[in-house]
Amino acid sequence: MTAVSQKTTTPSANFSLFRIAFAVFLTYMTVGLPLPVIPLFVHHELGYSNTMVGIAVGIQFFATVLTRGYAGRLADQYGAKRSALQGMLACGLAGAAWLLAALLPVSAPVKFALLIVGRLILGFGESQLLTGTLTWGLGLVGPTRSGKVMSWNGMAIYGALAAGAPLGLLIHSHFGFAALAGTTMVLPLLAWAFNGTVRKVPAYTGERPSLWSVVGLIWKPGLGLALQGVGFAVIGTFISLYFVSNGWTMAGFTLTAFGGAFVLMRILFGWMPDRFGGVKVAVVSLLVETAGLLLLWLAPTAWIALVGAALTGAGCSLIFPALGVEVVKRVPAQVRGTALGGYAAFQDISYGVTGPLAGMLATSCGYPSVFLAGAISAVVGILVTILSFRRG
């Protein structure tokens, strides 16, 4: 234990953790750049419905869910570095599929199919990337710093969303979807090169419980995470169309407001889950998320909507590390990658289910209704978290 403790405090370990987080930022631009553009591309350029928009966005997360188990086993048994680098390469392939969708002279259904293929590849890549980098980071700095590892990764992810959303809209409006796709293809390859020399961490040995027994240990924090995820899913999927329907500009900056507030909270308060425990931090965070989504639901102007998006980002920021601290406490070291992958899968399921369901709700009741649904989910998340951990 002493050796581990000393290792976790070395500057070299922290610098390696920074390199991993920066690579996550570069790779996750593959998600951030096209996120506000894909709904516009599917709805306006290909002429498909809101439900198809939801499918195009949400199907990525189903692919992530279905490959989380593989990603966890890969990280646990063969090394987290391999999982992370493999994920970066897959994310680059997703950009290649979108480039084909943009350049090939084919019909709208074929373009949509290529878009879906790219989203599926991206989902596979994301599961390898995030499971690998979380397990890699824990191996570098130790499980007592699990909140720090999750906070740094989260800052990278949502920093990429904050920067990527307006940049993606800018690239698309000036240079077209092909330029956007090419950019998303190159950035993960740069990340791969940047992380190539970061040292490996050894795979843990020991008896490995079954996946279902691991799920039995993590489902309570996972359920709270899933209910939190509805809020981000409705913003990521429908905020561009919501702004267009109201005649508002600055749609891309809603994700900047969300991501900026998210990152700021991680910088200022990312230490809280390690210090105070996950449950208290998660409950307060869900309250803030609820307030932000209610503002989006009722927003009379674009500026109020931006404030709502920022509040939602601030609320979502600490929930993953807060409840993730509880996951790390519950599982043995040799299945930590599997447990973190399974935990993140709850959020992926939430994202995947929310897209098409919210699309049907938006068609029936209008775009504001999806933000009300997100707020209700966050309130349910508060109740589930309080009741689950009180009984536990």
Curated annotation (Swiss-Prot):
What is the predominant subcellular site recorded for this chain? membrane
Topology relative to the membrane: Multi-pass membrane protein
Q: Name one Pfam family in it.
A: MFS_1
Q: Where are the transmembrane segments?
A: 22-42, 46-66, 97-117, 121-141, 151-171, 174-194, 224-244, 252-272, 276-298, 342-362, 369-389
Where it sits in the cell: the answer is: Cell inner membrane
What terms describe the molecular function in GO for this protein? transmembrane transporter activity
Q: Which GO terms describe its cellular component?
A: plasma membrane
What InterPro entries does the record point to? MFS (IPR011701), MFS_dom (IPR020846), MFS_trans_sf (IPR036259), MFS_Transporters (IPR050171), MFS_YfcJ (IPR037541)
Key words of the record:
Cell inner membrane, Cell membrane, Membrane, Transmembrane, Transmembrane helix, Transport
KW Transcription regulation (keyword) present: no
Any keyword Ribonucleoprotein?
no
The family line of this record is: Belongs to the major facilitator superfamily. YfcJ family.
The protein's name in its UniProt record: Uncharacterized MFS-type transporter YfcJ
